UniProtKB/Swiss-Prot annotation:
NCBIfam families: hutH (TIGR01225), PRK09367.1 (NF006871). The gene is hutH. This is Histidine ammonia-lyase. It comes from Bacillus subtilis (strain 168). Belongs to the PAL/histidase family. Contains an active site 4-methylidene-imidazol-5-one (MIO), which is formed autocatalytically by cyclization and dehydration of residues Ala-Ser-Gly.
Length: 508
């Protein structure tokens, strides 16, 4: 059980809820804050004080006063009119993350919603009823209005949901799950949609996958080092301590562990004095990606525990302030940074692929072909990797430098953070395929060298991946191999590190 209190949610907690399907519940203390904040909203409505979002219109209509009897209609109309998302739906895990993150944000007690609304979000989450939320349509300020409106639709029994593997009308899913729709009252519609939970949900899923992929790239790069008889001296601790970046030091340490008893690596001067940068500089390049991942994680964990609603209610309602916490600029920057960092893992991996298949750069069979000339072997795999890498370069263009004014120029600067997060997720997917291609080529190279000479760790890795992709004995449709191994990388852990006592205590 993950307990939500509005301030302590971590990426590890999110992973447990999203992928291990642990249930989530609100702490008693946070629910008390919610009730106090709600009482303040009800006083404002009763006393007919003019407060944005409670008894006024929205955006450009903020100066239009709404009568008390129209309060519920105001919130419903907001959700209906703002549900303008288009395109394919977010993956269910992202929809699931939105439910979790919105509940956690509301539990801070600054938004004035009823406890029943948070209970509805958690009921959807725990019973695995996932709103169908189109991916396109958010500007990233005022928060993720369109995506979160589709989330809100499901809570009130409208729109669509995924339930038990099927897409269906929301009311059908609610009945099957035993959930009653809620009716939104004062401020609740705005509190649901005025936030950054779509970009942050997409961002945290991207981060979780990127972190796993970063570890996987090191292990597969270790196989490549063996396949190319790489020089192990480049990973000597003294080199990396001399520079001082902890992440670089950690990558080098892990590579040394993976290759500690390898009979395929060489020493400087044995075959060559130096290796190419794509081998020699793995700690420097991969380490820089880890630096970025640390930055991204820090910003995500702040945002996951942030109040991003507007207005916010303080001091039991004595202080109600309109501000701009819904602006997604911090996450937009973080996601753009993540795109760049993961793209670099693909860039350097593609160069290692080239070194594995190019006969001018190694002493392996040309293109790792069992019968060069008659059979092309891995030749076009490098083309596929090059295409994916080039696509990443386009996707890595920063979304956060763009802005288009909206709402009659009232909302005249926006973050495009959700676009950045969506593109980051695609960059990760592309990079995973590049890494799968490197793995296929590295497996073949190590097999040619003699798997019996490989390190204990990489030998185990080799055996696991050979269950997914067989040896290349003749040309075949390699697309199937790439997709199978890509799927395996996404779903499986590569020899869980916690089972290796030698790695305990290392920064893994």
């Amino acid at each position: 059980m993950v307990t939500l209190d509005g301030s302590s949610l971590t990426t590890a907690d999110v992973a447990r809820v999203l992928f291990d399907f642990e249930e989530a519940a609100a702490s008693e203390e946070s629910m008390e804050r919610v009730k106090k904040s709600r009482a303040a909203v009800e006083r404002i409505v009763r006393d007919e004080k003019t407060i944005y979002g409670i008894n006024t219109g929205f955006g450009k209509f903020s100066d239009v006063l709404i009568q008390k009897e129209d309060s519920a209609a105001l919130q419903l109309n907001l959700i209906l009119s703002h549900a303008c998302g288009v395109g394919d739906p977010f993956p269910e895990c992202v929809s699931r993350a939105m439910l979790l993150l919105r509940a956690n944000a509301l539990l801070k007690g600054f938004s004035g919603v009823r406890a029943e609304l948070i209970e509805q979000l958690l009921a959807f989450l725990n019973k695995r009823v996932h709103p169908v939320i189109p991916q396109q349509g958010s500007l990233g300020a005022s928060g993720d209005l369109a995506p979160l409106s589709h989330l809100a639709l499901a809570l009130i029994g409208q729109g669509e949901v995924f339930f038990e593997g099927e897409r269906m009308p929301a009311m059908t899913g609610l009945k099957k799950a035993g959930i009653q729709p809620v009716t939104l009252t004062s401020k609740e519609g705005l509190a649901l949609i005025n936030g950054t939970q779509a970009m942050t949900a997409m961002g945290v899923v991207a981060y979780i996958e990127a972190e796993k992929l970063a570890y996987q790239t090191e292990r597969i790069a270790s196989l490549t080092i063996e396949g190319l008889q790489g020089i192990i001296d480049a990973f000597d601790e003294d080199i990396h301590l001399a520079r001082g970046y902890q992440e670089q030091i950690d990558v080098a340490e892990r590579i040394r562990f993976y290759l500690s008893d390898s009979g395929l690596t060489t020493s400087q001067g044995e075959l060559r004095v130096q290796d190419a940068y794509s081998l020699r500089c793995i700690p420097q390049v991969h380490g820089a990606t880890w630096q970025t991942l640390g930055y991204v994680k820090e910003k995500l964990e702040i945002e996951m525990n942030a109040a991003t609603d507007n207005p916010l209610i303080f001091n039991d309602g004595d202080k109600v302030i309109s501000g701009g916490n819904f602006h997604g600029q911090p996450i937009a920057f973080a996601m753009d940074f993540l795109k760049i960092a993961i793209s670099e893992l693909a860039n350097i991996a593609e160069r290692r692929i080239e070194r594995l298949v190019n006969p001018q750069l190694n002493d392996l069979p040309p293109f790792l072909s069992p019968h060069p000339g008659l059979q092309s072997g891995a030749m076009i795999m490098q083309y596929a990797a090059a295409s994916l890498v080039s696509e990443n370069k386009t996707l890595a263009h920063p979304a956060s430098v763009d802005s288009i004014p909206s709402s009659a120029n009232q909302e005249d600067h926006v973050s495009m953070g959700t676009i950045a997060a969506r593109h980051a997720y695609q960059v990760i997917a592309n990079t995973r395929r590049v890494i799968a291609i490197e793995a296929i080529c590295a497996l073949q190279a190590v097999e040619y060298r003699g798997i019996e000479h490989a390190a204990s760790y990489t030998k185990q890795l080799f055996q696991e991946m050979r269950k997914v992709v067989p040896s290349i004995q003749q040309d075949r449709v390699f697309s199937y191999d790439i997709e199978r191994l890509t799927d395996w990388l996404k779903k499986e852990s590569l020899i869980p590190d916690h089972q290796n006592k030698e790695l305990r205590g290392m920064n893994i």
